[in-house]
């Protein structure tokens, strides 16, 4: 049996070990290899693309299709360009209705450019390919992004090309032929003059999320296979002091590059706790420029200097939580006003507090709340009824969790015949679809309570899924779940007996609010980690599942089954024979 009572230090990422790093000024030099250190795979892919014998002129990069990511990739590509600043392109000389092309001799020529990297997250046809304009008989030619990127690299988001397939077909043709032809965008309105085509050589980086890449692969299977591929790594694994330093330098670089304040020495621990909540891992921190910039932009209004303090960051996070917390508070009010029945004291047979995460479309913050699961057992033919599934409110994953839970119980009891009970399980006061298996351990405990006729401690909530062998498996949304139950207990007054049971594998995901951490430190709230559902049963039901020399839950259930089977056997006689029993002397 493995039951671990977590200390307050287990509830947040370890930052005490890195105080010396936080105290150091993280000065960033323009020549620092920050990008290659944090994005080695993407850096290597760029080197392959820029090689004189590159296998393809196209590169696919998996990354969010936002300007921050495109600019980071563009800056990295610029540092690798060996021919940066080389004059390429040409000059169109327009004389009446006659247009002639010559080689560029200076950067001032209309279609000349110095080899560069151009990035755009959204473009229209004229922006990408340029256009011919005619006004009062005068003709002018406007260069597009492909002309600006001539001899260099064009970085563009995939959603632009997927939404405008004709742009992609023309761009691919230009890259493959290494030549740009002037054509009318509207076939019904041809160009008024003939414009000579021009040599144009460029490499293209297509940036997209997983869905965009999948759509592009379906549209261009051969090119997708031949293109150089890499990914922007959104997280950094913290394995030692060097990786912490690396992350701190990346955050500082991102802030300074965007003219925003960077974290001060006492702000780093708070930022790391918030970062761990974002990634869902204590030892994984985000490299996402969008996430970093959001924190720095919001706290910038609270500070005047080049750095922000821990107090300022903490205040910003509290303000954000309050600003986004209306729905969570209303849901808590429903419980506190007993419109939703959740007990946090006492004992109940077949009732247990599970934990769930609520996400509303359009709302930026997920929040947790307890859910009451109830189980009713009666004499029957061994049927287990999932009311959510029967009412078509349960998803497939939820149904799978229910079947796994039943399989474990039947395997443990080792019955020679069908169990003489029927049971029904449900999420009480749940009127929307339920899916996922994160409540399967709670459901199993409620079922065992009902079968054994032993009450469950209502001051303890539980989350976690379970496999067919009873092992507790990790689930998501853990911080929100624990904080949701803690908020209800806190409003009703903490007794020191309340707490939450989680799978041991979930401990690494914890990054809880300071208020909850303080309550655990003071012994007012407890979090237990278990490896197996049988480890949770003594905490919830005050009886062990199995053992020698003591009353156990398995023994209690087997005795109830034996009693029910005997009663069922008596009632199997035909009614005339049961009537004759009255005349048989004892």
UniProtKB/Swiss-Prot annotation:
The active site is at residues 438, 481. Belongs to the peptidase S16 family. GO terms for molecular function: ATP binding; ATP-dependent peptidase activity; serine-type endopeptidase activity. The keyword Protein biosynthesis does not apply. One of its GO terms (biological process) is proteolysis. Residues 346-543 form the Lon proteolytic domain. It comes from Escherichia coli (strain K12). Its EC number is 3.4.21.-. Gene3D superfamilies: 3.30.230.10, P-loop containing nucleotide triphosphate hydrolases. Lacks the ATP-binding domain. Keywords: Hydrolase, Protease, Serine protease. InterPro entries: AAA_32 (IPR041699), Lon_proteolytic (IPR008269), Lon_Prtase (IPR027065), P-loop_NTPase (IPR027417), Ribosomal_Su5_D2-typ_SF (IPR020568), Ribsml_uS5_D2-typ_fold_subgr (IPR014721). This is Putative Lon protease homolog. The keyword Repressor does not apply.
């Amino acid at each position: 049996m493995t039951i671990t009572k977590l200390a307050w230090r287990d509830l947040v990422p370890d930052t005490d070990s890195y105080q010396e790093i936080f105290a150091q000024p993280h000065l960033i030099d323009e020549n620092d290899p920050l990008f290659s250190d944090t994005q080695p795979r993407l850096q290597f892919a760029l080197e392959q693309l820029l090689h004189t014998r590159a296998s393809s002129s196209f590169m696919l990069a998996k990354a969010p299709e936002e300007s921050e990511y495109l600019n980071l990739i563009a800056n990295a590509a610029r540092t690798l360009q060996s021919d940066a600043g080389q004059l390429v392109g040409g000059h169109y000389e327009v004389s009446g209705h006659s247009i002639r092309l010559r080689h560029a001799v200076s950067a001032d020529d209309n279609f000349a450019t110095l080899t560069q990297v151009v990035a755009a997250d959204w473009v229209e046809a004229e922006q990408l390919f340029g256009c011919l304009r005619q006004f009062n008989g005068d003709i002018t030619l406007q260069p597009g992004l492909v002309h600006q990127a001539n001899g260099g690299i064009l970085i563009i988001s995939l959603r632009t090309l997927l939404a405008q397939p004709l742009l992609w077909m023309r761009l691919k043709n230009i890259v493959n032929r290494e030549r740009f032809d002037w054509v009318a965008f509207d076939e019904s309105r041809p160009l008024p003059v003939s414009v000579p085509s021009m040599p144009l050589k460029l490499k293209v980086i297509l940036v997209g999320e997983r869905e965009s890449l999948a759509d592009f692969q379906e549209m261009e299977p051969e090119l997708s296979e031949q293109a150089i591929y890499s990914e922007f790594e959104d997280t950094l694994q913290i394995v030692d002091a060097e990786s912490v330093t690396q992350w701190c330098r990346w955050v500082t670089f991102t802030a300074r590059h965007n003219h925003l304040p960077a974290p001060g020495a006492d702000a780093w621990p708070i930022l790391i706790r918030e970062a761990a909540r974002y990634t869902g891992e204590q030892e994984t921190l985000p490299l996402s420029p969008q996430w970093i910039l959001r924190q720095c932009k919001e706290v910038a209004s609270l500070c005047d200097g080049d750095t922000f303090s821990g107090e300022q960051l903490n205040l910003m996070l509290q303000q954000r939580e309050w600003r986004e917390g209306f729905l969570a508070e209303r849901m808590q009010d429903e419980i506190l006003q007993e419109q939703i029945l959740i007990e946090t004291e006492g004992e109940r047979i077949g009732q247990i507090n599970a934990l769930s995460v609520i996400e509303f479309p359009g709302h930026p913050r997920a929040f947790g709340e307890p859910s009451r699961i109830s189980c009713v057992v009666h004499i029957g033919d061994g049927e287990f009824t999932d009311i959510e599934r029967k009412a078509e409110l349960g998803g497939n994953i939820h149904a799978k969790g229910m079947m796994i839970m039943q399989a474990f119980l039947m395997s443990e009891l080792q019955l020679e015949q069908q169990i003489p009970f029927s049971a029904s399980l449900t999420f009480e006061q749940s009127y929307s679809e339920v899916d996922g298996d994160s409540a399967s351990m709670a459901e199993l405990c409620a079922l065992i309570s009902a079968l054994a006729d032993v009450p469950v401690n209502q001051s303890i909530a539980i989350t976690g899924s379970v496999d067919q062998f009873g092992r507790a498996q990790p689930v998501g949304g853990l911080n929100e779940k624990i904080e949701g139950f803690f908020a209800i207990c806190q409003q009703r007054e903490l007794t020191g007996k309340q707490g939450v049971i989680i799978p041991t594998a979930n401990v690494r995901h914890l990054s809880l609010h300071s208020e909850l951490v303080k309550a655990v430190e003071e012994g007012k709230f407890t979090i237990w980690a278990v490896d197996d559902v049988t480890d949770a049963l003594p905490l919830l039901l005050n009886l062990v599942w199995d053992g020698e020399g003591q009353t156990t839950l398995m023994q209690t259930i087997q005795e109830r089954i034996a009693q029910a089977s005997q009663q069922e056997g008596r009632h199997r006689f035909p009614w005339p024979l049961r009537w004759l029993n009255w005349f048989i002397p004892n």
